[in-house]
Amino acid sequence: MAILIVEDNPTNAMIIKHLARKVTHEEIVVETDGGAALALCHGRVFTMLIVDNMLPGMSGLQFVKAVRLMQRYDDVPIVMVTADHEPRLRAEAVATGVTDFLTKPVEAVAFRKLVADHLGGVPADMVAAR
């Protein structure tokens, strides 16, 4: 199985990928464009989606809405990671189908715990130790 990170900033994508690797051995795929990421989701099922909101082509919210229309993604956790701190965005994201919401800059321990909790494979005490 694999995790899909949809993030157009290469530095942010690298940081998120590095943090996720601390708690999973799953393949991690990075896509910089929402439309291309949506095409990937049509072709395969990811175990988790980590999505920025500000993307070229379509917003993270538009991406989530489109993914949630695919029945095979009904139970797949989607984490939105964005620099936008507006409470309105958080509410809209949850209403759209986002499972969890983190703001940038990402706090490493909280991010690793969130990923581990959703993947169900790494106890919280191991997350802090990695």
Task: Describe every region a protein language model picked out.
Residues 7:
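Conserved acidic carboxylate
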Residues 10-29:
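Two-component/phosphorelay signaling modules centered on CheY-like receiver
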Residues 30-48:
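Acidic, metal-coordinating helix/loop segments flanking the phosphotransfer/catalytic sites
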Residues 56, 86:
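The feature encodes the CheY-like receiver
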Residues 106-115:
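C-terminal output helix
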